[in-house]
């Protein structure tokens, strides 16, 4: 595989699993050194395994840092300092090369599904709003701000924010979550202007992705989602072998759920979404900024 990111340094937040891990794998495979961030103790072993995998398989420098993005004002400088430490490990200050972050992927996020005056969960309160916006909005803002002085000075930097199709659809019960992702897309356009001399800034808009978050949404949400996925051209599924290969050890479970509870319309896979993120990190994407690029099988197009 070509290594267009050789020698670059990337930060990927929320990269212990799912889309973040898939992005880290793609960047490392193409030569980038990677700092992976994670939050919970339960993700420590997964993250350690990913660091070892990427380092040994691709011969790049990979480290992780555990920090709570819900406390963004504390987390942002910790992440930048960890990135500096990683950079110094392969490019010591004595070498004369200035610390630089080439790629920032704001991927970490949390979900929220709660109606106004929800009959089961009660009314949305300030605590729920703060929980979601702290991680989905404030953390990307403060981390991008902290990284900005260390971006390249020649417009070769790349920032990609991971949003959600929820920001476009207006799902029932997603006032808080969809609002947070809409805010991230708006900030994308602002940063594209403010950081134009250093980096392109784009947002990737994924649809449903096979993994923990979509599984936890459950049958009620899947039924609510059905009209949207029915109209998405790439989500049609009928047991295709290439799709089942992507599901790996969960192929049987995937096949059963998609056929029986998702109306034969499949979610995407983390690696498919990571492919779009990767595309926006390339040199060839340098004329694209301030954009929301869909990685949702045509789902957003279906509601235009």
Curated annotation (Swiss-Prot):
CDD domains the UniProt entry points to: SDR_c (cd05233)
Q: Which reaction does it catalyse?
A: D-sorbitol + NADP(+) = L-xylo-3-hexulose + NADPH + H(+)
Checking SMART domains in the record gives: PKS_KR
Pathway it works in:
Carbohydrate degradation
Query: Which SUPFAM superfamilies does the UniProt record give?
Result: NAD(P)-binding Rossmann-fold domains
Question: What residues form the catalytic site here?
Answer: 163-164, 177, 181
Which Pfam family, giving just one, matches this sequence?
Answer: adh_short
Top-rank taxon:
Eukaryota
Which leading EC class covers this enzyme? oxidoreductase
Q: Which UniProt keywords apply?
A: Carbohydrate metabolism, Galactose metabolism, NADP, Oxidoreductase
- Has the keyword NADP been applied to this entry? yes
Q: What EC number(s) are associated with this protein in UniProt?
A: 1.1.1.-
The protein's GO terms of the molecular function aspect are: oxidoreductase activity, acting on the CH-OH group of donors, NAD or NADP as acceptor; quinone binding
Q: List the disulfide bonds.
A: none
Null mutant phenotype reads: Decreases growth on D-galactose and impairs growth on galactitol.
Cross-referenced InterPro entries, in alphabetical order?
A: NAD(P)-bd_dom_sf, Sc_DH/Rdtase_CS, SDR_fam
The biological processes this protein is annotated with in GO are: fatty acid biosynthetic process; galactose metabolic process
Per UniProt, NADP(+) binds at: 19, 68, 107, 177, 181, 209
Q: What does this protein do?
A: L-xylulose reductase involved in the catabolism of D-galactose through an oxidoreductive pathway. Catalyzes the NADPH-dependent reduction of L-xylo-3-hexulose. Is also active with D-ribulose and L-xylulose, and to a lesser extent with D-xylulose, D-fructose and L- and D-sorbose. In the reverse reaction, shows activity with D-sorbitol and D-mannitol, low activity with xylitol, but no activity with galactitol, ribitol, and L- and D-arabitol.
Q: Which family does it belong to?
A: Belongs to the short-chain dehydrogenases/reductases (SDR) family.
Record's protein name: L-xylo-3-hexulose reductase
Which gene does this sequence derive from? lxr4
